[in-house]
Regions:
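Acidic, metal-coordinating catalytic segment for phosphate/diphosphate chemistry
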Residues: 148-199
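Active-site proximal loops enriched in glycine and acidic residues that flank catalytic Cys/His/Asp
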Residues: 211-212, 226, 255-260, 276, ...
């Protein structure tokens, strides 16, 4: 899964500090993140302070510490939409002259190592672009993808909590913890994390999978049934309710599988397996799903990457307890 980045180590301990020259900086506007990209292979890497500052020095006054990976700090700069294209133009002006560290290229991932060797010798083969969360899904290596999408999640939270929901005053960063505090009434806002369940429903040797409607999600692949926990519910009650609402089925033997921080939707996903209880006729919730059906193990497609708990659950059903290992063998 996207958070499984070992041997790399993610540390979300709160600090107040300024970025060093080689620290990573995420510039974000409208949930789009500024990344460096190789022209030919489209390998995405994260800019560092020195190159951002060389082109747009005033941005560094807005830098906020986020977290570290392997003791390397990552920072956030919120960018107003009206400034986005100007910033991009200034960065592009200097891309052919700007030194880019070898370490930054090395971290781009094993798949693109050949392309990056050329990029080190010819910096003009690099460009900058505003990328979406969908682009981050394919980003290598995994620890950089995890860092990028976590930064987007924290940006969304900060953007939505600029003013106090109780009295309307402008919020300020806490000096002691990752929180936004109202200086007038003391209201404290923490990062948004919404609990949600995702359930693999089995019917003998078949698994229920669905597809979202185009207007409901950007994800076009096969998905498991999922939904947010409502007030006053246990996770197991949420499983039963969501399954009934989305596909009109009853389930039993609900068993916990794994959990996952899913920054793409500000959620903590709690994965369960459950067995069909009774009639297998699907009654589709058409405003959310475009289709749903029962699939044998042979009919379940292999996803390109195991970044989500839902995908891991599908591979667990398809290949057994060693699902991830067998999935990797099939990718070779």
């Amino acid at each position: 899964m996207i958070q499984d980045i070992a041997p790399h180590r993610y540390d979300n301990t709160y600090h107040i500090q300024k970025p060093g020259a080689q620290d990573y900086v995420f510039c974000i506007q409208k949930s789009r993140i500024l990344l460096r990209e190789t022209v030919e292979e489209h390998v995405l890497t994260i800019p560092r302070r020195e190159e951002i500052e060389a082109a747009v020095p005033e941005l560094m006054d807005r830098a906020v510490y986020l977290f570290s990976v392997d003791e390397k700090p990552y920072f956030l700069v919120s960018v107003p939409e009206k400034e986005a294209e100007e910033i991009l133009a200034k960065l592009k002006e200097g891309v052919g002259q700007m030194p880019v560290s070898d370490k930054n290229h090395m971290e781009a991932g094993k798949m693109a190592s050949g392309a990056l060797e050329g990029a080190e010798k010819e910096p003009e083969q690099l460009c900058y672009a505003w990328k979406t969360s969908t682009d981050i899904r394919a980003m290598e290596p995994m620890h950089q993808a995890f860092a990028a999408i976590t930064a987007v999640q924290l940006w969304r939270w900060r953007q939505s909590r600029q003013f106090c929901g109780r009295c309307g005053a402008k919020t300020q960063d806490s000096k002691n913890e990752r929180a936004l505090v109202c200086p007038v009434c003391g209201q404290t806002e923490y990062p948004k994390i919404s609990p949600a369940v995702i359930v693999a429903i089995t019917n003998g040797d078949k698994l229920l999978m669905s597809r979202y409607r185009v207007n409901h999600s950007t994800y076009r692949g096969y998905a498991l049934i999922a939904g947010f926990v409502e007030i006053g519910e246990t996770f197991e009650e949420t499983v039963r309710r969501e399954v009934m609402e989305e596909v009109g089925l009853k389930v039993k033997n609900i068993r916990y599988f794994k959990s996952q921080p899913w920054a793409f939707t500000d959620t903590e996903m709690i994965g369960f397996f459950a067995e069909l209880d009774g009639d297998d006729k699907i009654r589709l919730q058409e405003d959310e799903l475009s289709e749903a059906g029962w699939y044998t193990r042979e009919e379940i497609p292999d996803d390109a990457r195991l970044i989500s708990v839902g995908t891991e659950m599908k591979m667990y059903f398809k290949y057994g307890p060693d699902g991830e290992k067998k999935w990797q063998e099939h990718q070779k």
